[in-house]
Amino acid sequence: MRSNTVILAALPLVASAASTSGNWGGGVNYSKIFGGGLSANASIHYPGQPDYNTTTVQRWSTWAEPTFAVTIKPATDEDVQYIIRTANKYNLTFLATGGGHGGETGFATVKHAVNIDLSNFKENVLDLEANTLTVGPGNSFSAFETNLYNAGKMVPVGNAFCVNMIGATIGAGVGPYQGLHGLVIDALRSVRLVTASGDIVTASDEENPDLFWAVRGAGANFGIITSATYEIFDAPNNGNVVLAEFAYPGSVNGSLWQLLESWGETYPKEMGLTMSASYSQTTGTTSSSASLTYFGTQEAAQPWIDQLLALNPTQWRNATLPWSEVSQNSGFGTGASVCATGKYNNHPSVGAKQTSVSTYIEVFNQYVEIMKARPWLTSALVVQRFNTTATLAVPESKRGVYPGRDFSSLIILENYYDGPRHDADVYRFSKKLRSQLVATSGFDSLQTYINYAHGDEGPEVWYGKDNLPRLVQLKRQWDPEGKFGPGNPIPLA
């Protein structure tokens, strides 16, 4: 999920864990199969029940979504263990849901599955003596950010406050503060997870280190994480961040890309930046924008802000906020809107290590013409910029799987539209635009960040060609039947 421009019918009765009543989904009595072995605080829910959409996690995007015959909300690690072992016994497909933000084509292959909704796992422990934060998969970034800020601490986080912390972590976790302490996986110190066989294991540098390596970037393929512990850091500038946002006419987009290119190696580690250009179907006009965060003083941020002011924004604002409140307040105060669930959207993306002004201008011009011819389409060209000093400073043995540590930018094609009847058309033009961006990305072939992936890129792109042989070996060891990771699967051969 990105910063603001910024998966059956059943009876209408919720079955408790102790219930033995006949509740059915897709011709299978899931309450009978699972109900007897769950803890008292676990529950079983069926699509079609009046409160299903409010008692279970709903997906952020309905594009390429999985379908579920039943949702089970475990309350303990042993519940997750029991669900996996029981599903294996009855040959039932299952999928774990944390925040519901995953959006790749592979999820559409999951049909009538058992949804393991992890929203009960609210563990949230700040240990200042050990300098760690331990969270469960029921927590978004916002669940712990305020506590960290109040303690004078920080941890790398993603761009949107509503995204699941562990879900973002297992894909690497890019974000506005990664210039200071690296990716979210770089702060990860251990996980507890339930494997495909239903075993509960710990993975860290000391225990199951090969599994821990794989979890950091390919975690969705190896189990269901029920707890994760992170190292935390002292927050600079008393934890306060300068947020500066700028709105411009669409004609300024080229000047924004030129500015981005000019910053090059001088781009500071304290800064996060998102630039975008879009077209309004309502007004028939284009617009562009920039959102800058600086983890430091106003004085230190001002030279960068001044360069954006020199482009004569039609609207702008400058505020100093606790780092824990920046995401919610982005988008001129509309940051929460990016978290709305149930929209139909996808986001092909490209990792880049250089800025091509002419390509960005040309791609945006083509995008505008595409949107003008398709009144059902709302799209934006989004560029997120990062300082790579901290990500590249991580020792090779500690890096995990993520192959994009040298990405200075992620370029995203955001597509919102009204449903699957347009999928083929959107894929066709998105693939063409993506290819143009790849050609001047500074890489010889398509690179991307797995949490922004479309799903067609393949495992060499998601995980890195050099990492794949070791990953395949570990996949065979820990998940030999391919139970996990349908969104971005690691092959077994």
From Swiss-Prot:
Extract the InterPro entries matched here. BBE, FAD-bd_PCMH, FAD-bd_PCMH-like_sf, FAD-bd_PCMH_sub2, FAD-linked_Oxase-like_C, FAD-linked_Oxidoreductase, Oxid_FAD_bind_N
Indicate the enzyme's highest-level EC class. Answer: oxidoreductase
Task: Cite the entry's keywords alphabetically.
Answer: FAD, Flavoprotein, Glycoprotein, Oxidoreductase, Signal
Q: Which residues form the signal peptide?
A: 1-17
**Carbohydrate-modified residues:** N29, N41, N53, N91, N253, N318, N387
Outline the extent of the FAD-binding PCMH-type domain. 63-235
Report the induction information: Expression is positively regulated by the azaterrilone A cluster-specific transcription factor tazR.
GO MF, one example:
FAD binding
Enzyme Commission number(s): 1.-.-.-
Q: In which pathway does it act?
A: Secondary metabolite biosynthesis
Job description of the protein? FAD-linked oxidoreductase; part of the gene cluster that mediates the biosynthesis of azaterrilone A and other azaphilones, a class of fungal metabolites characterized by a highly oxygenated pyrano-quinone bicyclic core and exhibiting a broad range of bioactivities. The first step of the pathway begins with the non-reducing polyketide synthase tazA that assembles one acetyl-CoA starter unit, five malonyl-CoA units, and catalyzes a series of Claisen condensations, methylation, PT-mediated cyclization, and finally releases the first hexaketide precursor through the R-domain.
* Similarity comment: family membership: Belongs to the oxygen-dependent FAD-linked oxidoreductase family.
Task: Quote the protein name from its UniProt record.
Answer: FAD-linked oxidoreductase tazL
Native organism is Aspergillus terreus (strain NIH 2624 / FGSC A1156)
What would be the name of the gene that encodes this protein? tazL
